[in-house]
Regions:
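Glycine-rich phosphate-binding loop
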Residues: 78-103
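Glycine-rich N-terminal segment of FAD-binding domains in flavoprotein oxidoreductases
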Residues: 1-12
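ATP/nucleoside-binding phosphotransfer catalytic cores, i.e., glycine-rich phosphate-binding loops
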Residues: 141-144, 148-174
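Ligand-binding beta-strand-loop-alpha-helix segment within the catalytic cores
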Residues: 14-84
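Gly/Ser/Thr-rich loops at beta-strand to alpha-helix junctions
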Residues: 1-3, 89-92, 160-161
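A short alpha->loop->secondary-structure connector
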Residues: 12-16, 102-104, 173
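Class I SAM-dependent methyltransferase SAM-binding "motif I" and its flanking Rossmann-like core
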Residues: 94-141
């Protein structure tokens, strides 16, 4: 994902000042300054590099239900046009791991318990030292919220995700 964002930041004349940015997911129970937070990763790869109109970060401290409700309200105010996403080694998009991915989810933002494969990916990607240090709970945009965007751009670097991409494209929907 970093390659895509870096490339986007170098395209001349993109109207960044008209972009309202959201991010798709983040861990609960990490301090706001934790480098593993996706808001902080995006800060370093995108938010600090271009003059965005607004940036909405998922807060990770507070009551999870209130976090979800407040973020969902912001999404109603500024619906998503474009999503840049990837696929995890277990096939997750955002933090919609296969066991909780719901194409009929009535919510737009929800709390999820992360699948162990997803958590191990965070260790394998050197974001955390051990699986025990990876948060178990997270906030994520739901599948219907993601699919409501006008356009989705999915990039999946790394051979370790080959099976997940193949299953996503050619496998049965379960």
């Amino acid at each position: 994902q970093s390659e895509v964002l870096n490339a986007l930041t170098t395209i001349p004349n993109l109207p960044w000042d008209q972009v309202v940015a959201f991010h798709m997911d983040d861990y609960l129970d990490l301090p706001p300054e934790a480098p593993q937070r996706f808001a902080n990763w995006l800060e370093g790869h995108l938010f600090s590099k271009v003059p965005l109109a607004e940036v909405h970060r998922i807060p990770t401290l507070g009551l999870p239900e209130e976090i979800c409700q407040n973020y969902a309200e912001k999404l109603v105010e500024a619906p998503i046009d474009i999503i840049c996403l990837g696929i995890g080694v277990n096939g997750h998009i955002a933090f919609n791991d296969p066991p909780v991915a719901d194409f009929e989810d009535p919510l737009s933002v929800k709390v999820v318990e992360l699948d162990e494969i997803c958590r191990q990916q965070q260790v394998d990607d050197a974001c955390f030292e051990s699986i025990n240090s990876v948060p178990v709970m997270a906030v994520t945009l739901t599948i219907p919220q993601l699919l409501a965007a006008d356009a989705l751009f999915c990039t999946v670097p790394g051979i370790q995700k080959r099976a997940a991409v193949k299953a996503t494209i050619a496998g049965p929907i379960s």
